[in-house]
């Protein structure tokens, strides 16, 4: 089964308009998204080419014209998928840590959907155990370890600040 390499949150009351918005915005970059089946209301699971590069362009687009984004909220690339067990997520994160230099400031960012096994704080403690980098910075990190837990699966990414689109924050 194909796995998404881009997650986009949207207003669940306007899924059709959100899908049109995504398609329209990506069409401007000559990109055709493949929408995969998503069991979660308010979340599209999508496959596109080079999602991190696309998001960098969309961040610039949103800064210039935030009105293009009315129905979508967060656009997050996914590097790897694994099971949402602590052990599997730690193993996947450990594989990404080499992308964080010793001098880099970093943080972990977790979003949970249909997952009640652990509270977010407990997850943060357990998942950061495998990150042997000294410089944590929650406000201005160089690197973000993004964990999107969707039931029994977890999408995990190592992102630069401009590789994740947070539309509500950019509109402020």
Regions found by a protein language model. Give the residues of each.
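SAM-dependent transferase fold signal centered on methyltransferase-like domains
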Residues: 1-172
């Amino acid at each position: 089964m194909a796995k998404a390499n881009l997650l986009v949150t949207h207003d669940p009351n306007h899924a059709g308009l959100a899908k049109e918005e995504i398609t329209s915005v990506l069409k401007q970059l000559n990109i055709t998204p493949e929408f995969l089946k998503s069991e979660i209301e308010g979340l599209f699971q999508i496959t596109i080419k080079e999602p991190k590069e696309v998001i960098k362009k969309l961040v610039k687009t949103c800064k210039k014209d935030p009105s293009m984004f009315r129905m979508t909220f967060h656009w997050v690339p996914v590097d790897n998928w694994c099971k949402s067990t602590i052990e599997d997520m730690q193993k996947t994160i450990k594989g990404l840590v080499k992308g964080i230099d010793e001098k880099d400031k970093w943080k972990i960012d977790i979003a949970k959907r249909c997952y009640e096994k652990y509270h977010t704080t407990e997850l943060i403690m357990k998942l950061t155990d495998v990150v042997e980098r000294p410089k944590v910075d929650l406000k201005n990190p160089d690197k973000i370890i993004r964990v999107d837990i969707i039931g029994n699966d977890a999408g995990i990414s190592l992102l630069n600040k401009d590789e994740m689109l947070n539309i509500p924050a950019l509109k402020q």
